[in-house]
Amino acid sequence: MTSEQMAGNRFLDLSIEELMKIEVTSASRYSQKLSEVPSAIFVISQDDIRRSGATSIPEALRMAPGVEVARLGTDKWAISIRGFNGRFADKLQVMMDGRSVYNPLFAGVQWEQQDTLMEDIERIEVIRGPNAAVWGANAVNGVINIITKKAADTQGTLLSAGGGSFEQGFVGARYGGKINEETPFRVYAKGFTRDHMGTISRGN
């Protein structure tokens, strides 16, 4: 583990033995201990997201070193690793639970469509550097894997609300239940009121 990987992260509170046991999946498609991963990987935990007050995935990604986050409008973002930033960056593999959300029609990721409830994200794994051998041609500059909680871990009802500088107000609702003992599910909805803005704000 490098200091950069751990900086600003809740894992600083863990012992060396506990750090060695943390598992990630984005580096090689299967679960590995963080100490065994050869790539430069940074993990954003649910605790990190909650403490930061991030209301969207792009805002949460500002915590990852080496990730450039630019806000292009009310709900449009440009996100890249190792430069080459633009509205649709085609050299970055972005996944939700291991499945690519890359849109070949636009040759990039529509971040405004990745609007899952922040409370339902377990962690975000960010890998800097080429990983095309594992994740394909888009993974030239890096990989972002957004891993959500299992449906079995999000049972019951959740209501959330808040606001900010550009997002005047938002509300989210989620319900988790079971069809049977082996088939849990969850459904959610979000609504928001946003200011129109055209300036660019940049992250790391």
Locate the predicted segments by residue.
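Periplasmic-side early beta-strands and strand-to-turn transitions of outer-membrane beta-barrels
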Residues: A133, D153-T154, S160-G162, R174-N204
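Extracytoplasmic beta-strand/coil segments of soluble accessory domains associated
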Residues: S26, Y30-L34, P38-F42, P58-N103, ...
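Non-catalytic regulatory/gating segments with a bias toward low-complexity or hydrophobic composition
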Residues: L19, I41, I49, A60-L61, ...
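Residues embedded in well-ordered beta-strands within globular domains across many folds
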Residues: M20-E23, E68, E122-E125, N145, ...
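Short, acidic, small-residue-rich periplasmic hinge/interaction motif at the N-terminus
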Residues: M1-R50
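N-terminal periplasmic accessory domains that precede
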Residues: I57-A60, W77-R82, L92-M96, W111-T116, ...
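Short sequence motifs at beta-strands and strand-loop junctions characteristic
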Residues: G73, G136, G164-E167
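Short acidic/polar hinge/loop motifs at secondary-structure boundaries
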Residues: S100-R128
